[in-house]
Amino acid sequence: MKMYSKFILFLFFLLLSASAYAGGGGPDSHDVAVHFPPSFASYHDADINGIGAILRHRISHTPFNLVASLVFLAAIMHTFLSSKFLYYAHKWKAEHQKKIETGCASESSTYLPAEIFHFLGEVEVVFGLWAVVLSAAVIFFYDWHTFVNYVSGVNYTEPMFVVVIMTLASSRPILKLSENIMSRIAAVFKGTLAAWWLTIMTLGPILGSFITEPAAMTISAMLLAEKFYELKPSKKFKYATIALLFVNISVGGTLTHFAAPPVLMVAAHWNWDLPFMFTNFGWKAVIGILTSNAMVFLVFKKEITSLENIFKLSQLKNEIREKYIHSDFLKKDLKMAEERIGHDLQQEFTRIKTAAKESTLTACSCLDDGECNLLEETFEQEFEDLKIQQMSVSVPGLLPRDKRPKLSDPNWDKRCGNVPGWIMAVHVAFMVWTIINVHYPAIFVSGMLFYIGFAHVTWPFQNTVNLKPPMLVGFFLGGLVIHGGLQGWWIAPVLGSLDEFPLMLSATILTAFNDNAAITYLSTLVPGFTDSLKYAVVAGGVTGGGLTVIANAPNPAGQALLKNYFSNGISPLLLLTYAFIPTMVMGLCFFLL
């Protein structure tokens, strides 16, 4: 008990120290700022020949470069092991659940290693987790102020934008609008599963050039989940579809100069406008998307045909539910049955209470009247508390309204019903506002706060506003940009030493292990880039954007929305394998056309 008191006292004084430090205004103004990370010019290696020699020189100049890259490598390896962590987490949870069922463990207990492995298996937390390790390394090698200056200087606009646009794009009005548009196109081809699959995989990515890639990814992934993944296709088809989606989204934003993050990073610097993007990238991307879709469709045509009956049955069920099942009458009948059960249950509670009270009050023979009255009063309160606690778990609907716990309808987001046009229009306005102000976080974040209020007011036409997936994706991207800012010391020399084809190939490969926007941004810092080299590095960056979850900013959004359809999450190795052929097709389109 003494040790516990000392620990509490220590935490209290630690909190006071932090408050005093904050109240003091932080670091002194005379603290000398360390240039971290060092500028490329500070290496003075222009006269050094050979990539190996340049990199060795930069490591000797700033040893922390190697540390930062080793931490980044560890984070990448962690992403490839995430499915293994989830496998053991699920296995241990199942074993612990059996112990609970057999009475060998308490119902409220949990197996801590399983929870830790589940946390480590969440791809969205990987880079944020390793950013903590990187931060500790910066503080150890330099100091606290260097760390603060670095993280304060990192541009978090893209992670913040993805959080906001993903929240808006996943709203019921936007999804209904997108579904209505795509259903009209799919209806031209009789509204079959094949028509829906091809429409989503073609139109969704191309829309990314106008509504931004993260929004296109969110809409496409949610529609694929509803129309395709719910049908439980084979493991091969699942991976082929998500890999193709990632590749298509990555190149689908190249019809314009403002929608794809890797293009946005260079467009202003190199004066690339909309006509330039469409004539040099856009039409080639469309050909690549159509070609890749056709190839995957032909490979899995037999399976799509076998899934058609299941798809038609699910569509028919939805139509029958909307037209013929009168849910209001059913709810009324169920409510009456609930009241009858509630009456019987209340009688049973009274019987239990009477028996327990008689047994408890036998102790009154040893107590005076005051103590006996107190015992009776305590029993009444304890019984009422236990009754409410038990009913909250088993039959919360039978409790009085003021005692009921807040519950959410698990099928609320799957309900039928249309959304008024004016609500759709307001949601489109929110998205347009966000896209127009993409460079101004204070403005588009304020717009999101306004949207949350609007969604609350119009709740009957909304799905549950679930901020967890967007926030996790934002955490992922935030961690990635913190790591990416310290990788330029080796990426820039590699990009600057290559000719067109090797540069495009290298950009594609590097993109698999670093965000493609970071790759293209670093290319703007390389002096003497010709127009053909500029084309090659951007083409390589967008081509490789589907190889891994970290390759393109919208990928974590798709991963977060679809991961539950894959056992133990999405395997990075299988994703890489199934994305290889579509990536080759896109690369050939950009290189040969």
Locate the predicted segments by residue.
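N-terminal secretory/membrane targeting signals
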Residues: M1-G25
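Interfacial loop-to-helix junctions that mark the boundaries of transmembrane helices
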Residues: I54-N65, I116-E124, H145-P159, L274-K284, ...
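Membrane-interfacial loop-to-helix junctions in multi-pass transporters
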Residues: H61-N65, G153-M160, A186-T199, L231-I242, ...
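Hydrophobic mid-bilayer segments of alpha-helices in multi-pass membrane transport proteins
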Residues: L66-Y87, E122-I139, N155-T167, I219, ...
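Transmembrane helical segments that form the transport core of multi-pass membrane transport proteins
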Residues: K99-A105, F140-S152, S170-E179, I200, ...
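Short helix-coil transition sites and intra-membrane helix breaks within transmembrane domains
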Residues: L168-E179, L207-I219, G252-A260, I509-L522, ...
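Hydrophobic transmembrane alpha-helices that form the pore/transport pathway of multi-pass ion
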Residues: K190, A194-T254, M265-V266, Y521-A539, ...
